[in-house]
Amino acid sequence: MAVPKKKTSKGKRNQRHSIWKAKAGIAAQKALSLGKSVLTGRSQGFVYPIDEQEEAEE
């Protein structure tokens, strides 16, 4: 079984943790932006399935 030779320093651990948190923040920001784009109805990059019942009512 692979075992690390030395203990990782707190600085290195914090650096890795901050990178992980930054990536998560960027992903959350992109998801929020995408959600806002979909809700406005002006997004051109999506194809929405249209229910036949909705077309009949209109």
From Swiss-Prot:
Note the Gene3D superfamilies from the entry: Single helix bin
Q: Name one GO molecular function term.
A: structural constituent of ribosome
Q: Which Pfam families does UniProt cross-reference here?
A: Ribosomal_L32p
Q: Does the keyword Ribosomal protein apply?
A: yes
Q: From which domain of life does this come? A: Bacteria
Where does it sit, as one GO cellular component term? large ribosomal subunit
Q: Name one GO biological process term.
A: translation
Entry annotated with the keyword Iron = no
Instruction: Give the record's keywords alphabetically.
Output: Ribonucleoprotein, Ribosomal protein
Matches recorded under PANTHER family: 50S RIBOSOMAL PROTEIN L32, CHLOROPLASTIC, LARGE RIBOSOMAL SUBUNIT PROTEIN BL32C
Q: Which family does it belong to?
A: Belongs to the bacterial ribosomal protein bL32 family.
This chain belongs to the protein called Large ribosomal subunit protein bL32
The major lineage groups are: Bacteria, Bacillati, Cyanobacteriota, Cyanophyceae, Synechococcales
